[in-house]
């Protein structure tokens, strides 16, 4: 690969433990392949709140709130080798983690 290339990996998940486990696995695999790794960098957590009425017809002031949090991490791999890319492609990560890769 070219000299000043880098791979940027963004991970998203609702479960922060699963996200940290996946990020650790990616960092460990990239370091074993001989690349420079920076991260995982925690990005701001998105919080989505939904408010609904508890009763169907009346009791407007009785409401219930639900929230869902999206946790994010960023990993940069500088000067990746072909061995690094191959080992990252073979990596088996758990379901529930969204992975976005930019070259």
UniProtKB/Swiss-Prot annotation:
Pfam families on file: Ribosomal_S10
SMART domains: Ribosomal_S10 (SM01403)
Membrane spanning residue stretches: none
GO terms for biological process, alphabetical: translation
InterPro entries to which the protein is assigned, alphabetical: Ribosomal_uS10, Ribosomal_uS10_CS, Ribosomal_uS10_dom, Ribosomal_uS10_dom_sf
GO molecular function, one term: tRNA binding
Any GO CC annotation of this UniProt entry: ribosome
SUPFAM superfamilies: Ribosomal protein S10
UniProt keywords, alphabetically: Ribonucleoprotein, Ribosomal protein
Subunit structure: Part of the 30S ribosomal subunit.
UniProt record similarity statement: Belongs to the universal ribosomal protein uS10 family.
Chain's role: Involved in the binding of tRNA to the ribosomes.
Name this protein carries in UniProt: Small ribosomal subunit protein uS10
Source organism of this protein record: Clostridioides difficile (strain 630) (Peptoclostridium difficile)
């Amino acid at each position: 690969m070219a000299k000043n290339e880098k791979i940027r990996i963004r991970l998203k998940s609702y479960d922060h433990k699963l996200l940290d486990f996946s990020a650790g696995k990616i960092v460990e695999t990239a370091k074993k392949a001989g690349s420079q790794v920076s991260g995982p960098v925690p990005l701001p957590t998105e919080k989505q709140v939904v408010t609904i009425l508890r009763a169907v017809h009346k009791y407007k002031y009785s409401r219930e709130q639900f929230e869902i949090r999206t946790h994010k991490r960023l990993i940069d791999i500088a000067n990746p080798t072909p061995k690094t890319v191959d080992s990252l492609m073979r990596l088996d990560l758990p379901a529930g983690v969204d992975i976005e890769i930019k070259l």
